[in-house]
Swiss-Prot record:
Name of protein: Protein-methionine-sulfoxide reductase heme-binding subunit MsrQ
Known cofactor(s): FMN; heme b
Species of origin: Salmonella dublin (strain CT_02021853)
Main localization (coarse): membrane
Keyword RNA-binding carried by entry: no
Organism superkingdom: Bacteria
Subcellular location: Cell inner membrane
Disulfide-bonded cysteines: none
Function noted in UniProt: Part of the MsrPQ system that repairs oxidized periplasmic proteins containing methionine sulfoxide residues (Met-O), using respiratory chain electrons. Thus protects these proteins from oxidative-stress damage caused by reactive species of oxygen and chlorine generated by the host defense mechanisms. MsrPQ is essential for the maintenance of envelope integrity under bleach stress, rescuing a wide series of structurally unrelated periplasmic proteins from methionine oxidation, including the primary periplasmic chaperone SurA and the lipoprotein Pal.
CC per GO annotation: plasma membrane
Phylogenetic classification of the source organism: Bacteria, Pseudomonadati, Pseudomonadota, Gammaproteobacteria, Enterobacterales
Any GO BP: protein repair
Cofactor: how and how many bound: Binds 1 FMN per subunit. Binds 1 heme b (iron(II)-protoporphyrin IX) group per subunit.
Gene this chain is encoded by: msrQ
Chain ranges passing through the membrane: 10-30, 82-102, 116-136, 153-173
Keyword vocabulary terms for this entry: Cell inner membrane, Cell membrane, Electron transport, Flavoprotein, FMN, Heme, Iron, Membrane, Metal-binding, Transmembrane, Transmembrane helix, Transport
């Protein structure tokens, strides 16, 4: 049975809650001692992981809609992508304001150059920014065929963001490896699409 437009609307409501509730939890954890002895790192990792989760969810929509024969699922992809950008922005903001400090933002440029994993992170964020700004139907009409070409760059983020996570941790743990593996699996599902590009 295929999902109806009304069911998709309710699904979108649930996805908005999924994007917002982690923020409420984070505020609660900050104010009630729910973080570790290094709360700044906790906030950075939590926001970064949440952005990655929404990135993976965004990449999952197309193959899921195709294999499950639920074409209306595609309508949730933009919403998931926007939440990915929101959490990626919170991740970047937490680094800039909590790690560097508001009085040391001038150091951000040198930090990006001296730490390659930060370079990958900012490239990913800039791509997400471009995709967010052009996610409207108006932008799609204006860009025409170029719109799809631009939005295919999300696959670059699917490569760079997990590498950014892997590179940023001092001690390799299963979590970043799992995220990287899931990203590769979702990219592998698009093998035929990538193969057509290179013909």
């Amino acid at each position: 049975m295929r999902l109806t437009a009304k069911q998709i609307t309710w699904l979108k409501v649930c996805l908005h809650l999924a994007g917002f509730l982690p923020l409420l939890w984070l505020f609660w954890a900050i104010n009630h001692g729910g973080l570790s002895a290094d709360p700044v790192k906790d906030i950075q990792h939590f926001t970064g992981r949440t952005a990655l989760k929404f990135l993976l969810a965004t990449l999952l929509v197309s193959p899921l809609a195709r294999y499950a024969k639920q074409p209306l699922l595609i309508r949730t992809r933009r919403l998931l992508g926007l939440w990915c950008f929101v959490w990626a922005t919170l991740h970047l903001t937490s680094y800039a304001l909590l790690e560097l400090g508001i009085h040391n933002l001038a150091l951000l440029g040198s930090e990006l150059i001296s730490r390659p994993y930060l370079t990958l992170g900012i490239i990913s964020w800039l791509v997400l920014l471009a995709l967010t700004l052009t996610s409207t139907q108006f932008a799609q009409r204006k860009l025409g065929k170029r719109w799809q070409t631009l939005h295919n760059v999300v696959y670059l983020v699917a490569i760079l963001a997990p590498i950014h996570y892997l590179w940023s941790v001092k001690i390799l743990s299963p979590q970043p490896v799992i995220y990287a593996t899931l990203a590769l699996a979702l990219l592998a599902l698009r093998y035929r699409k990538f193969r057509q590009w290179w013909r």
